């Protein structure tokens, strides 16, 4: 589960959304260590049973989050990971379908759009049971960038399309507390909208590359998203 999986598990523990969480990793000792470490924080949040297990434990789960996959290396795009990560999915998903699992399958690995489709095809589950994280992280990054000038919780804007280099911001629907973003900027004395929007979009699109170059992987943002 490594960085992304462990960060998501930590975020879920803090939210107290579940009464039980099982961690599965090819390195079982790693999953055990993460479960122990997370469990030691439970006195400060909601009661929850966190433990390391294997696929026989997932039959009664309401939600399975798959984060397994090769990480982007500096200079790689998400699409460069397709062959490796589809291969990993092919080793994981059949172990899930072999159980009586009837819950939701969520994919949080790259390239997430391709892998979500692959997971649905491999599993045979109906499309309404297989989801990907999509552009939720990109949307959070956009709201953060705009929100550096205001409270980001007041910013309403979305990124659509691929979670990757072809993603697109929907500026026409962007607003701050219900005020159209362009109008809001003019009220604050800022009129160079197009140049600023293009710069913000590029910062959002390229932010993963910037983070990977500096620390090797991204995981906190997607865990919160």
Predicted regions and their residues:
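Conserved NAD(P)H cofactor-binding loop of Rossmann-fold oxidoreductase domains
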Residues: 68-70
């Amino acid at each position: 589960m490594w960085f992304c999986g462990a960060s998501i598990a930590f975020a879920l523990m803090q939210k107290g959304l579940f009464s039980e969480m099982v961690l599965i990793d090819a390195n079982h000792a790693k999953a055990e260590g993460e479960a122990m470490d997370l469990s030691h924080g439970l006195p400060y949040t909601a009661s929850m049973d966190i433990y390391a297990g294997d696929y026989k434990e997932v039959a009664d789960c309401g939600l399975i989050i798959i984060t397994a996959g090769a990480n982007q290396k500096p200079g790689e795009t998400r699409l460069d990971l397709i062959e490796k990560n589809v291969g990993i999915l092919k080793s994981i998903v059949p172990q899930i379908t072999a159980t009586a699992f009837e819950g939701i399958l969520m994919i949080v690995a790259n390239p997430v759009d391709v892998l979500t489709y692959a997971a649905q095809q491999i599993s045979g589950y109906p499309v309404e049971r297989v989801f990907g994280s999509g552009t939720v992280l990109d949307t959070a990054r956009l709201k953060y960038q705009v929100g550096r000038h205001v409270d980001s919780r007041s910013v309403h804007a979305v990124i659509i399309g691929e979670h990757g280099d072809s993603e697109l911001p929907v500026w026409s629907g962007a607003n701050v507390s219900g005020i159209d973003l362009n109008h809001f900027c003019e009220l604050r004395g800022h009129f160079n909208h197009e140049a600023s929007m293009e710069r913000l979009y590029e910062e959002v699109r390229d932010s993963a590359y910037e983070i990977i170059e500096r620390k090797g992987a991204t995981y906190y943002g997607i865990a919160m998203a």
